[in-house]
């Protein structure tokens, strides 16, 4: 980044010490594009140098101090301008003075806490970044560099299957089963649908993966539903006693781990939505929440002991509080 002042300009660059060996991860930007960023985990040290290059070697650059910050920040799009920082670390690199030649300043943030996963959604963005600042009397010179953080989880201690009978009284009665209630992002959802009673003409059946993003609190709560995937289970009329298998691979979809009440600002939850459509185009559905989590690769040698300990653990199974709507399949056989 260049700053043009009274005869002098400076280019600021942030360089990581392990840039050549550190893995990069794709991450969606605010405009929907995907870019690659350096990947970090909770507890890892962030170190490098801030390089200053003077454009005019015969002129000096006066400043009021130079610093580097590591920041974790949440931005709600409906409240732009108010950035909620949950991590804020500062290192002073130079006291007020002047720079007469290009030079570099080393920095290190040791075992940095990075409690949440990087996330860019419909109404919220959670980002981590380094920010170098040269303080000036008129305008500061600022350079930022974003990084991506992934939160790794251990295998859930409790991971029971989901099994439920649903239907419409005297019309439709089915039993569905999913092999687990918690899936890692590259997992396979295995299950089956069993038709106990069929007295309406079903022509189509599918499972949708729905991401529900909730932002804000109190009266300023916003819900955003996004259908991530549609998986056709059946095309045609089922008969009583028929069993239809389900095998849905998650690796091909853009999914994040489930995020609950992140810094009391937002949540991201996932649901499997079983949808049936009859010949009169009426839709019947049943939603079931599932937990998604990020499975670590083979433990990396470069991953610190603190980062391994900091891997998240799941609590017990969470049940879905449901809202009755027309067309929703009931689990107590009552007519909707």
From Swiss-Prot:
GO biological process: cellular response to type II interferon; intracellular protein transport; regulation of neurotransmitter receptor localization to postsynaptic specialization membrane; retrograde transport, endosome to Golgi
Phosphoserine: residues carrying this PTM: 302, 304, 319
Gene3D superfamilies in the cross-refs: 2.60.40.640
GO CC terms: cytosol; early endosome; glutamatergic synapse; late endosome; phagocytic vesicle; postsynaptic early endosome; postsynaptic recycling endosome; retromer complex
Keyword Phosphoprotein set for record: yes
Transmembrane segments: none
Ranges in a coiled coil: none
Name of a matching Pfam family: Vps26
Membrane topology, from the record: Peripheral membrane protein
Entry comment describing in which tissues the protein is expressed: Ubiquitously expressed in developing embryo and adult. Highly expressed in brain.
Subcellular location: Cytoplasm; Membrane; Early endosome; Late endosome
Keywords: Cytoplasm, Endosome, Membrane, Phosphoprotein, Protein transport, Transport
Function field: Acts as a component of the retromer cargo-selective complex (CSC). The CSC is believed to be the core functional component of retromer or respective retromer complex variants acting to prevent missorting of selected transmembrane cargo proteins into the lysosomal degradation pathway. The recruitment of the CSC to the endosomal membrane involves RAB7A and SNX3. The SNX-BAR retromer mediates retrograde transport of cargo proteins from endosomes to the trans-Golgi network (TGN) and is involved in endosome-to-plasma membrane transport for cargo protein recycling.
UniProt record similarity statement: Belongs to the VPS26 family.
Assembly notes: Component of the heterotrimeric retromer cargo-selective complex (CSC), also described as vacuolar protein sorting subcomplex (VPS), formed by VPS26 (VPS26A or VPS26B), VPS29 and VPS35. The CSC has a highly elongated structure with VPS26 and VPS29 binding independently at opposite distal ends of VPS35 as central platform. The CSC is believed to associate with variable sorting nexins to form functionally distinct retromer complex variants.
Protein name in the entry: Vacuolar protein sorting-associated protein 26B
Species of the source: Mus musculus (Mouse)
